[in-house]
Amino acid sequence: YNHQDVQITPDIYQAYWDKSIYSLEQIIRSPSTPANIYTNEVMRKHNIKITMAGDLGDELLCGYPRHRRVAADQKIKTWKDLCRYFVLGGKPAIKVNKNLIPKEEVLDEFIKTFSDVMWDEQDKLNSFCLLELVTVCPEDFLNRNDKFGMAYSMEGRYPLASKTFMQYCMAIPSTEKFSKFQLKNMS
């Protein structure tokens, strides 16, 4: 095992901006994409062929500050409330369409796509995390790692994305996943 730190400088970040967009074939709302693609290049130069990613860990184990906010939000009482928070809350949406599509219409389409079968009124935070797992994770994380790996002829593996492990984590009540003082209580 030969660990190597990868340093990301402002010059590297700028130099890999266009390559990250080209490889993804789209712009996504992640400021880390230039650093991610550069890291893939460094791995390839060290003859790495298969990469292991820890993606999904935060979503499975309530590791983000937003998870604490969801748990504390008293306005989230229904699936629609949770979807409203997910679609309209959190990070502000980029005004790509100049708001031509009303936000409520976007919310209605989202709810048609993702049914309330994921809603657990006893654990709204686990419901939120499950929603992240079926939306953000495949669209952003898995897609990004797959395309960046392909750009350098590497294959990405996602050990936390196994069905068994995901079901295990989602069966743990969210109250056990973080404490009042610490996110990622279980990691």
Model-derived features: where do they sit?
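Core structural elements
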Residues: 40, 133-141
